[in-house]
């Protein structure tokens, strides 16, 4: 195996959108392949037809591309080892099912689901771990054939089970976990390799595919550890060498310490959800790669090229990776600060249009206004959809201050500062950020009020917010009419509150 070319695979099931955990598996396999100048194979494992979602494969492929992951072979681009959808490989699987049946390493099982469940219930009652019990124990070959013929005559459809040898230890040196071993009597008995509908089970099909596609390394989540001894059983039955395995730790919710579950609605878990919020693909790539893998040094922001250069599976963590939403927001903010402004404009415009704040085809002048709005908030946003809430003041009619804002203004010498600032603004012909800041400085000179006592009342009176972007830029975008209306309303409200 050491001399073989590196070939890895990412093999999702088309059961829905691309999950954070699956995206991490894809990223680690991608980085491992690119670091070693190897091959990444995309394979669609769609044998569980009951769980398949229409368009699921296409959705996952699109989101993988969005993240910046490409592959060398797959259902969309072909390759020498196809087909790359398991549903198109049934004849291939049947060949090896037949081989194991002919060699006596597998057999037809006619036990019904009801009989199997009754068997499991009985075992639980006895305090025994549920497992399959060989149904032909003590029978001759002729007796087995007769029993199977009678079952077929009754219209029963069989599954195919593989024999689990007794007293065998299945072991491997895991890239992440180290040496692991399972005794054959802990697997649960002879397991199904072909279902009643003729489709192979996961643990059988994956072995056939990995062997025929010459996969050298299998990097996947550690929820697959219990599958590995079953797969090693199939490898041994067919006389094949197994690939190198590496099982990555689970991802946990940093807020709860529990495994990141699709049922946990406190965390967004699908790549498509982050796309809709306006997260950047480079930031998602960066953040997800650091979920369970540690680069050299203290830096947390890396380019794809740097990740490829550094990636070493030996640095995969043995402890669960914590998914921290605030950390993701911070990482995305770092990327937004240096992102192409046209890219941010496109994302934010989509968010504003979706919220009904900007029309579908804005005129050039309106587009320039939106561009200034986006540039103003770019460093403040964790993702572009935040612009909808941050910029509401620019899309609403002049309104009264909130009680909280009134209380804040009462702390300072608000009225004289606001009255003088209104006079200074009234003199302006060109309502630009530079001129507005000049008006604030003139207010300072005329009133002697300075620092927070000057800036906070003016900010609250004009923008209806105690925090925000540069006050001059914000007022320029609001326009003189709106700002003056806000100042008039503020002075009226202060009078009503008895603040002179």
From Swiss-Prot:
Instruction: For this UniProt record, give its keywords in alphabetical order, as a comma-separated list.
Output: Aminoacyl-tRNA synthetase, ATP-binding, Cytoplasm, Ligase, Nucleotide-binding, Protein biosynthesis
Q: Record's SUPFAM superfamilies?
A: An anticodon-binding domain of class I aminoacyl-tRNA synthetases (SSF48163), Nucleotidylyl transferase (SSF52374)
Quote the CDD domains the UniProt record gives.
Answer: GluRS_core
Q: Protein biosynthesis among the record's keywords?
A: yes
User: InterPro entries, from UniProt?
Assistant: aa-tRNA-synth_I_cd-bd, aa-tRNA-synth_I_codon-bd_sub2, aa-tRNA-synth_I_CS, aa_tRNA-synth_I_cd-bd_sf, Glu-tRNA-ligase_bac/mito, Glu/Gln-tRNA-synth, Glu/Gln-tRNA-synth_Ib_cat-dom, GluQ/Sye
Highest taxon, organism lineage:
Bacteria
> Which reaction is this enzyme known to catalyze?
tRNA(Glu) + L-glutamate + ATP = L-glutamyl-tRNA(Glu) + AMP + diphosphate
Pfam families named in the record: Anticodon_2, tRNA-synt_1c
Give the residue spans that cross the bilayer: none
Q: Which GO BP terms sit in this record?
A: glutamyl-tRNA aminoacylation
Q: What NCBIfam families does this protein's entry cite?
A: gltX_bact (TIGR00464)
Its quaternary organisation is: Monomer.
Name of the protein in its database record: Glutamate--tRNA ligase
**Which species does the entry assign this protein to?**
Lactobacillus delbrueckii subsp. bulgaricus (strain ATCC 11842 / DSM 20081 / BCRC 10696 / JCM 1002 / NBRC 13953 / NCIMB 11778 / NCTC 12712 / WDCM 00102 / Lb 14)
- The gene that this protein is the product of is gltX
